[in-house]
Amino acid sequence: MERPGPSDGSDASGPDPQLAVTMGFTGFGKKARTFDLEAMFEQTRRTAVERSRKTLEAREREEEMNREKELRRQNEDLEPTSSGSNVARACSKSSSRDTSSSESDESSDSSDDELIGPPLPLKMVEEPVNPMEEGVLGPLPPPLAEDVEEEDDDDGDSEEEENPVRKIPDSHEITIKHGTKTVSALGLDPSGARLVTGGYDYDVKFWDFAGMDASFKAFRSLQPCECHQIKSLQYSNTGDMILVVSGSSQAKVIDRDGFEVMECIKGDQYIVDMANTKGHTAMLHTGSWHPKIKGEFMTCSNDATVRTWEVENPKKQKSVFKPRTMQGKKVIPTTCTYSRDGSLIAAACQNGSIQIWDRNLTVHPKFHYKQAHDPGTDTSCVTFSYDGTVLASRGGDDTLKLWDIRQFNKPLFSASGLPTMFPMTDCCFSPDDKLIVTGTSVQRGCGSGKLVFFERRTFQRVYEIDITDASVVRCLWHPKLNQIMVGTGNGLAKVYYDPNKSQRGAKLCVVKTQRKAKQAETLTQDYIITPHALPMFREPRQRSTRKQLEKDRLDPLKSHKPEPPVAGPGRGGRVGTHGGTLSSYIVKNIALDKTDDSNPREAILRHAKAAEDNPYWVSPAYSKTQPKTMFAQVESDDEETKNEPEWKKRKI
């Protein structure tokens, strides 16, 4: 940068005498400075190069520190020791001092350059200038003590990132009472505004976090599947529909307010090939929405099929997947799920196998592991990680296993000693994919159910939460809210959260006070206390109970005395005795009993003498041919038997 000398400036830019006379002063003070654009551009280029070099050095130092931490983690336990952290901190401080010294040297070299801008005040020029401050653009760095504090904060943040247990939001909890029976289904919409619960009591209840207060009451309760247990509830990826899977053979889809949108059709159970039916023919187990395609979902059933459906076409399924054993026989799928991108369909079967299909190829599975869990047990849950490469399975053999679908020939890890007694016990991944969560079951009065956390990288049991004195059936870790929902075997649903780590959800309703119940306005009859009131307004004095009962006994209305029979003609809607009117007398006489109890032989012989004296019918016909009446002779049975032939006689 060029500065004009005093001699040059006096000739070129001296005061104009005419202007001085007009304005009343002799000069304008200091002279304007000139700037060299090329020098300014060169200075800017140097600054950019220096900053990029510092950024690259910082990245290299960070990579070296990460490599050192990985080596220490492999050689030592899970948590880094204090000595290792001190060494790393000392190394980082020494490297920072080296870089600061090199930066000071370079800045001192560049301090010889000329200044840019107007001249500094006199006080600042007289003060000693730190060579570190000349080449710095922007605000000055903080003191050394603050640097040390920031380094400590960074170390704390890195330790928190390394230790995923600190990210578990379990400092606070709320309890939602669904009912008295097992909470077998949980669902939370993608935004985290509404929670839906279902249980063995056939009820589905809706909970709105923004609308609830500290009483935690559901705003709607219904029974969408009548007398069938609710097995699965899941919101669609848009949050406007809920898939309801119950113990029946027909799944239902309802909207956010509980109104039915569609119901799957039931298939023909008399057809052998289940692919030729239009729907399921046996009890359902679970269901799942497609993560990408709106309106598509999947169900599995006891008819040994996994079917995909569309909301727009409830009269027939979209496709059918038929799990098979290695011998080609039918096998019942107990749970199913989509991968995170929706390209794969995974199902766990009763023979202990896990089968994975390509969604567009329904014939043969893409992956098939036949002994994933013990045969004859119900695998209750399979779920994919958020990165889509790892599959977790919760078996009925009290195990939790982790699988890599890129090498689906053996499990990566396996954890045992996790009892389960429900066919819908859940397992899920944390939002950062570093933890796996599942629940345990207990007998009544034999302990408390737990929520167990495993680290995905080492599969070590790193944390446990005692939920309640009942089994833990369902668990759900919402990625947006960072809150954990748990369904238990005693009808409770619990929500775990941390005010500092969680968002919205349970935090919205905890701060609201419970509304006071409105007192019902009851109208009571006022007593007339004045003793000299009119008789029609006067009320009787309160008597003793015994006297009041005796008086009520004499009252036919209060004692419910039966009505006496009506004498004479009927009245008051009651029929009187017979014969009171002409019509009743006629009816009574018509309906008389006229049965003849006389002897018929005597009645005939009564007319025998008259018939003999005055024959009219039979006797005149025989008067000439047979004037004397002849009767047949009575023969004994012995004579009849004698006249019979020998072959007709009875043998004794």
UniProtKB/Swiss-Prot annotation:
The modification Phosphothreonine is found at T577. Belongs to the WD repeat GAD-1 family. This is WD repeat-containing protein 70. The modification N6-acetyllysine is found at K450. The gene is WDR70. It comes from Bos taurus (Bovine). PROSITE patterns: WD_REPEATS_1, WD_REPEATS_2, WD_REPEATS_REGION. The keyword Heme does not apply. The keyword Repeat applies. Residues 45-76, 538-563, 642-652 have a biased composition (Basic and acidic residues).
